[in-house]
């Protein structure tokens, strides 16, 4: 019997080890193309032959899904390599083959979930819109969850013929045929082999570029949607919706499906976009914190930059914690999210005649007129459905809810209690980003809440009337940084201040699939519509992409770095009260680690005067300085053989400055020098003088203090020195250097921030 137990145990152990070795995963594999043997006709031939050689050299094994290694995608534009399903033994064999650089497991990617053209001061008579022809013939790629092609935002009224340089396709699939593309939506493709490699039993319910989520449709219409008249979000924000670049061409690459969102599919989408000839890429997805050399968005964006394509990416919605930012690589345009000057309201009229404009997005014309209002400390915590159920005549009663710090839970409980309406007292900035408001009611601030409570306490029969579906413009202050917008510095590389720019991202009206539920009334009435309000840096990134696209149309010779520089150095750090832009998290002045250089100003970006340009070699020099292993360097840069590392430099020619200091004893000590080179993109000769604003407890100096340009496209360099001395209690401090044109109109501003490194890690 003991022998039998021993044999059974040995068999079980062997089976367990076999399954562990045989278990396959999808890997992203980076190869050095310079080492591709001459026998292969192209990269795909090399990749498929590599997998075939693995099959021949490694004993066959079967896991739950796969009986052999399998090639998923071949990549050659934004990176060189492939994705493949491999066991650990097969991966080990692959590592021994010529050209192998690195490999890491496929991972999931997360989404970072109108009036804004007016707020951005875009107009048809002057500035960036007419100068760029509204972005005409620039091709913007939106990598997301697909598109709803029937939307009015994607009709091609007024669009000329498709540019001949376009190489992409309109790929047919489920509920999507090639005729659904047009002169606006010139391309639609989809990528889901990574999902199927992860689990071949999955049934892709919408195997096409059609959007069943809404995120992609919304983002695409923000960046380049055509003019769509007479739209609104259930009566809020009524008017004409239009994208930032309404005459730009859209190419949609769906890599995010209901069944999953994988890195291998994302890379394939970006690789194809660059091959198709797009000018700009907008992506509103990111990862949790991972190293730069495993961040596929950063790696693929580096490859896109090398081919002259700028990537605009969302900073993420994990704010307001310091260092919470995604997509902060030096070659990416990283976009933060801000509130605009538009607010949505319901007017609260008390029985004594006092009118208060409360915040509301209740999606219907509810009839709340002269209804009784009640308030008591226990009930008005609004945290107990049981207590609220004891309210007499709830269908005709308005309850006041105190601020208990959990508005969403209060709204859920109020809705389930089926009360007539509620008056919520809250100053939580998160409340004013959500478009979900299923129960009649308004949100008022604490001061207004006291007025309402005093009225109720001092009235025998207190009543109130609430009207809904109201939209107001020119709210002050605006813009304001959204509390959820992720903050820098970037964990990818601390030496550059990120994010780069602030763009509209809170309650943005844009297109949406009409068969996807958008909001609700009560607990069981689900509503859908063609246009909805959404919030997040996901909405900010396509705004920036649309502006960048128009700058590319107006200045086709500008590099990705020049476009980003123009947007940053002309950004406005002040709000519409001409005071520093505030952070809605703490109501204090925002820093460059919250909002970048400031709020994007498209018309000023058209004519920035000077730009901080950077070549692909400049980014390579930066990578050379980061003490990466050869494997890590080549994973990003593809091949060390094709790059020169003789001049490594961590000081990239960037239009912002960050100095991170360490704490030594009771004092912080810092002295850091930066070298910058600016290019004159004005009309001709010009002279600029430096205007300095030092961060608190700092001195800054610049040499030379005057830059003289004799010709357009001439370059001049300067050195900025920051010296900081302070006690350990000091935190982030802000300054700036502005090059002011003498006898001219240009003002070229770069933010400066000093911050203790201990706050990041």
From Swiss-Prot:
Tissue specificity field: Expressed in flowers, cotyledons and leaves with the highest expression in roots.
Induction entry: Expressed in response to mechanical wounding and insect herbivory in leaves. Not expressed in uninjured leaves.
A Gene Ontology term for the protein's cellular component: extracellular space
Site, as annotated: Cleavage: 38-39, 52-53
Disruption phenotype: RNAi-mediated knockdown results in partial loss of resistance against M.sexta larvae, impaired systemic induction of late wound response genes and in reduced levels of cell wall homogalacturonan (HG) and pectin methylesterification (DM).
Glycosylation, residue list: 177, 203, 376, 697, 745
Top EC category: hydrolase
InterPro entries according to UniProt: Peptidase_S8/S53_dom, Peptidase_S8/S53_dom_sf, Peptidase_S8_Ser-AS, Peptidase_S8_subtilisin-rel, Peptidases_S8_3, S8pro/Inhibitor_I9, S8pro/Inhibitor_I9_sf, SBT
Domain Peptidase S8: 116-606
pH-related activity note: Optimum pH is 7.5-8.0. 60% of the activity is retained at pH 11.0. No autolysis at pH 4.0-9.0 in the presence of 5 mM EDTA or 5 mM CaCl(2).
Chief location category: secreted
Post-translational events: Propeptide is internally cleaved at Asn-38 and Asp-52 in a pH-dependent manner leading to the dissociation of the propeptide from the catalytic domain and resulting in the release of the active subtilase. Cleavage occurs at pH 5.7 and to a stronger extent at pH 5.2.
Pfam families in the cross-refs: fn3_6 (PF17766), Inhibitor_I9 (PF05922), Peptidase_S8 (PF00082)
Keywords: Autocatalytic cleavage, Cleavage on pair of basic residues, Disulfide bond, Glycoprotein, Hydrolase, Plant defense, Protease, Secreted, Serine protease, Signal, Zymogen
Spans annotated as Necessary for prodomain cleavage and secretion: 756-761
Regulation: Inhibited by 1 mM 4-(2-aminoethyl)-benzenesulfonyl fluoride (AEBSF), a general inhibitor of serine proteinases, but not by the more selective serine protease inhibitors N-alpha-tosyl-L-lysinyl-chloromethylketone (TLCK), N-tosyl-L-phenylalaninyl-chloromethylketone (TPCK), leupeptin, aprotinin or benzamidine. Its proteolytic activity is autoinhibited by the non-covalent binding of the propeptide to the catalytic domain. No effect on activity by the addition of CaCl(2) or calcium chelators.
Cystines in this chain: 170-181, 382-401, 624-645
EC number in record: 3.4.21.-
Domain Inhibitor I9 stretches: 26-110
Region (Disordered): 574-598
A biological process term (GO) from this entry: self proteolysis
UniProt propeptide residues: 23-112
Similarity section: Belongs to the peptidase S8 family.
Oligomeric and partner information: Homodimer.
Function: Serine protease. Has preference for Gln in the P1 position and Lys in the P2 position of oligopeptide substrates. Active also with His in the P1 position. Involved in resistance against insects partly by regulating expression of systemic wound response genes and possibly by its post-ingestive activity in the insect gut. Apart from the role in defense, may be involved in regulation of pectin methylesterases (PMEs) activity and pectin methylesterification of the cell wall.
Protein name as it appears in the record: Subtilisin-like protease SBT3
Gene name for this UniProt entry: sbt3
């Amino acid at each position: 019997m003991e022998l039998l137990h021993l044999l059974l145990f040995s068999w079980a152990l062997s089976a367990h080890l076999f399954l562990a070795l045989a278990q396959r995963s999808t890997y992203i594999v980076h190869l050095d193309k310079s080492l591709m043997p001459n026998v292969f006709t192209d990269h795909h031939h090399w990749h498929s032959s590599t997998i075939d050689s693995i099959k021949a050299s490694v004993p066959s094994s079967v896991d739950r899904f796969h009986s052999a290694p399998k090639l998923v995608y071949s990549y050659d534009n934004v990176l060189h390599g492939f994705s493949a399903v491999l066991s650990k033994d097969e991966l080990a064999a692959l590592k021994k083959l010529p050209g192998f650089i690195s490999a890491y497991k496929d991972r999931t990617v997360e989404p970072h979930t109108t009036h804004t053209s007016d707020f951005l001061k875009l107009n048809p008579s002057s500035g960036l819109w007419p100068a760029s022809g509204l972005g005409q013939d620039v091709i913007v790629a939106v990598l997301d969850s697909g598109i709803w092609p029937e939307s009015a935002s994607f009709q091609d009224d007024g669009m000329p013929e498709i540019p001949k340089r376009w190489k992409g396709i309109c790929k047919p699939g489920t509920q999507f045929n090639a005729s659904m593309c047009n002169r606006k939506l010139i391309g639609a493709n989809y990528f889901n082999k990574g999902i199927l490699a992860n689990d071949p039993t999955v049934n892709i319910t919408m195997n096409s570029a059609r959007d069943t989520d809404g995120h992609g449709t919304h983002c695409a219409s923000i960046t380049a949607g055509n003019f769509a008249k007479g739209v609104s979000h259930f009566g809020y924000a009524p008017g004409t919706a239009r994208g930032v670049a309404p005459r730009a061409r859209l190419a949609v690459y769906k890599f995010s499906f209901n069944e999953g969102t994988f890195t291998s599919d994302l890379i394939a989408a970006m690789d194809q976009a660059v091959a198709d000839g797009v000018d700009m890429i907008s992506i509103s997805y990111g990862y949790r914190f991972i190293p730069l050399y495993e961040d596929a968005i950063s790696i693929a964006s580096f490859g896109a930059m090398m081919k002259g394509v700028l990537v605009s990416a969302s900073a993420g919605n994990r704010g307001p914690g310091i260092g919470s930012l995604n997509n902060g690589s030096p070659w990416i345009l990283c976009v933060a999210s801000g509130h605009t000057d538009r607010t949505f309201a319901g007017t609260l009229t008390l029985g004594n005649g006092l009118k208060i404009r409360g915040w509301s997005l209740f999606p219907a014309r509810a009839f709340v007129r002269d209804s009784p209002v009640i308030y008591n400390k226990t009930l008005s915590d609004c945290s107990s459905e049981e207590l609220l159920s004891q309210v007499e005549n709830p269908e005709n009663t308005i309850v006041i809810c105190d601020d208990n710090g959990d508005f969403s839970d209060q709204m859920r409980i109020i809705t389930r209690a089926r009360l007539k309406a509620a008056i919520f007292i809250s100053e939580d900035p998160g409340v004013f980003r959500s478009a979900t408001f299923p129960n009649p009611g308004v949100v008022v601030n604490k001061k207004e809440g006291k007025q309402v409570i005093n009225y109720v306490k001092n009235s025998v029969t207190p009543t109130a009337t609430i009207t809904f579906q109201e939209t107001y413009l020119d709210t002050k202050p605006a813009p304001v940084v959204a509390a959820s917008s992720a903050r820098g510095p970037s964990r990818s590389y601390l030496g550059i201040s990120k994010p780069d720019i602030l763009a509209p991202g809170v309650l943005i009206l844009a297109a949406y699939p009409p068969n996807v539920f958008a909001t609700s009334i009560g607990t069981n009435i689900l509503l859908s519509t063609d246009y909805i309000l959404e919030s997040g840096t996901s909405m900010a990134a396509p705004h920036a992409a649309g502006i960048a696209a128009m700058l590319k149309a107006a200045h086709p010779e500008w590099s990705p770095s020049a476009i980003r520089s123009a947007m940053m150095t002309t950004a406005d750090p002040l709000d519409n009260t001409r005071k520093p832009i505030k952070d809605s998290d703490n109501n204090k002045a925002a820093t460059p680690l919250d909002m970048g250089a400031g709020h994007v100003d498209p018309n000023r970006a058209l004519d920035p005067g000077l730009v901080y340009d950077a070549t692909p070699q400049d980014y390579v020099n930066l990578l050379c300085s980061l003490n990466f292993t050869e494997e890590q360097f080549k994973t990003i840069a593809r091949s060390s053989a094709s790059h020169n590392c003789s001049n490594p430099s961590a000081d990239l020619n960037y239009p912002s400055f960050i100095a991170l200091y360490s704490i030594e004893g009771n004092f912080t000590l810092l002295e850091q020098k930066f070298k910058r080179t600016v290019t004159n993109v004005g009309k001709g000769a010009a002279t600029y003088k430096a205007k300095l604003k030092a961060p608190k407890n700092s001195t800054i100096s610049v040499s030379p203090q005057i830059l003289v340009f004799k010709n357009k496209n001439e370059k001049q360099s300067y050195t900025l020195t920051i010296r900081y001395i302070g006690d350990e209690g000091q935190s982030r401090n802000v300054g700036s250097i502005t090059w002011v044109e003498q006898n001219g109109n240009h003002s070229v501003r770069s933010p400066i921030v000093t911050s203790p490194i201990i706050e990041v890690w």
